[in-house]
Amino acid sequence: MSTSTTAGPGRRGILRRSGARGPGRATTRLASAGFTLIVGLAMAVLLIQMQGFEPFSTLAAGVQYAVGDPTSIARTIAWGLPLYVAAIGVAIAFRSGMFNIGAEGQIYAGAMASALAGAYLGPMFTGAHLALCILAAAAAGAGLAGALGWLRAAWGVDEVLSTLLSNYIVILFCAYLATGPLRDPSRQSGTTREVVDTARFAEILPRTGLTGVVFLVVALCALGWWLSEKSVIGYRWRMTGESPAFADAAGIDVKGSRIASMVASGALCGIAGAVLVTASQGRFWTEIGSGIGWDAVLVALIGRARPVATLVWVTIYCVMRAAARGVEQVSTVPSELSLILISAIIIAAAARAGVFGQFAAFRHRFLRTKGR
Amino acid sequence: MSEPLTNAGRPLLKLAGITKTFGPITANEDVTFDLEPGEIHALVGENGAGKTTLMRVLYGMYQPDAGTIHVDGEQVEFRKPSDSIRYGIGMVHQHFMLVPTFTVAENITLGAEPGRAGLFDRKAADEAIRKPMSRLGVDLAPNTITGTLNVATQQKIEITKVLYRGARIIILDEPTAVLTPQETDELFVLLRKLADDGSSIIFISHKLREVFAVADRITVLRDGRTVSTSATAATDPKQVVAAMTGRGDVNLGRVHRDAAVADVVLRAEGISTAKHRHDAALDGVSFTVRSGEIVGIAGVEGNGQSVLAEALIGTVPLTAGTVNLGGREITGLGVADRRTLGLSYVPEDRHLEGIPINGSVLEGLSAGRLRSRRSWRSWGRAFPKAMRAWGSELIERYSIKTPGYDARCSTLSGGNQQKIVIARELEENPSCLILAQPTRGVDLGAIDFLYGRIAEATARGCAVLLISADLDEILRLSDRVLVMYRGRVAAEARTSETSREQLGMHMMGAKVTETAA
């Protein structure tokens, strides 16, 4: 019997190293993060050296720009707020085995919905107007992702494909709206009308871009963590993601869990879009997402869909981006190089986090074409 | 059975002081094993006792950390399987290594094809496999497609393959797991014939009845060490079990139960399904299970038993027929509703369906309690203190050996994993329990424990449907037994009025009697 019962760990499920709570794992993860950062640092030194600058002082200037004083910290965080929400959203879907790579599209849908609610409703009491904008965004994202989740649950339409393709449909449709019927006639480029003032978060630290939305973001991250890791709902979602056959045989509503987790994921991504509109941009324009949805997917993968790890990685990512902007200012190291650097670091992190194994699992899923 | 071989000079094969560790785990420690020419030597032990590791060391798949291997008195070192093949060692794996779409000749010669320049010389191959085939009494056209043959014949092809490669030492890993009792007997005749012709056979098994039927000597491993080696004639099953488990009180006979059989709890009428994965479709299956009763479902794997279990719990839809539980029709209901109405289920594939293999013990135990919690309470904490205390209490009560409720299920042994499943299912206090292969890959001590819990459940009035490929299990536990063949109930009998041989006949579909439910 001995050979037959040794099934490989997690033949199904995307994030197979889940449910780990043993001691020693935290240190492994820290070591892994440390490795990644060292690789990144070495790469940075090399790239800056190649441009003929003194690497360490240049880097120090970048780090100074990112986290050197309270103002810069606030600025760095403010830039990252939508990413925190979107990354938590993506992680929640991953945890229940739904590979929601449609985050970018859901962010656009949410941004559009909140921009419209902000521009065409009101002015009214600020709190109510903001709530309306955020709810509209959540509804748009949730509806979009939920529909794709339903397709997967009911018809076996693979969500990897459907969410990926939905990005193009949604982003291009929003671009059509912003350049066509809903275009702000007073502007040249493709934007919608500016939201009224009651649909904007007030800055809490002057000239940092850090607004009151930070409280909402903290609350949403806490909610996402609770939902996914602590609640009964999260238990069902995680079981559905890790061991779908077990969940099915145990009487857990697998289809319902898949749809519900996609709804939650889409709602959070939609809210990330609303954060972009109501806390910084003030309107929808055709490039508003600037790849935050893709960043969210990457960060959630590196964080292996654990909410806390994902949030930590979002923070690291934000600091890196800000530092790269800082480096760009003090040297002629172009921003393209900082993007290369970030990509390399992500690859190193991904290698450590077993992301490639996860991609192999996806490929396997496609080759077998067995929609469960 | 033949006379024990204790004389002879130098053994054909001698493993001495074999030690193999995997990280902190010692799989083999100072293991000694030898094999005489013309001998059938059984290697027995529980799961994880180190049988497979030892054989993989012998077959060159693992390198031992310490110890020596002698073949014909010559010390050898096997770095890969081809090394050991060169010394005449052949392995018949539990899972056949045959290409179903290849012909018999292609499969047998695969990896050592006659002919030159990469071309397959059909004639030479047909010629070359003739001799080993006739040694086994296999009479098949060499161009038969392997996939069309039945399991027992495929197994013979596997053995032919080993003989074709010139093996003098044949390792058989759990060869009877896939066979009916009759096919098992045939295999034993064949093995005896091979041994009489001078081949030596290492027979790995945990089924004692078979070991005693075929082996000349028995070596018992426990926890990676050799516990005993004795001639079959000089020992008995009780001693061997004691050596395997380290306990003297393991029951091997019929499980004692005091349960009064009462009203019908589960009634299946004419249920049919579509074909599902590798299993046969159900075709009008009808039966009842009464309160306090254990009904066994016997049959060669792939005759619809797995589908039956899944159709009853609700993961496979019916195409016809009805299922009643306690007088209530549950045909159209989902798994959750069926479970709420008192149905419990121990699935066949423990790692996929029984437990969340990468989840924690507590997550595996609590599925029944968390499944049905509704509405706003689902937003609450899944594992508050009370739940964790409940989990710890279950771990205690079902003596699940684990560092704690938050240990990963995958780190537990098969027996302890199965205890998680049984604990969860029995804690729901079911009126009907479906057991699918409940003791597969479970060690003898844990089997004893699980049977005890099942007997207690029937004493409380639980109706049990026991689906098992292990006839001994069915004969030890059940009151009635149904035999499935090609998706139908081929026979039904009271356990006290039937025999292993009779059931075996029905399992092969030899004689289809009138079905009565």
Where are the regions a protein language model picked out?
Chain B
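Glycine-rich phosphate-binding loops of nucleotide-dependent enzymes
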Residues: 2-517
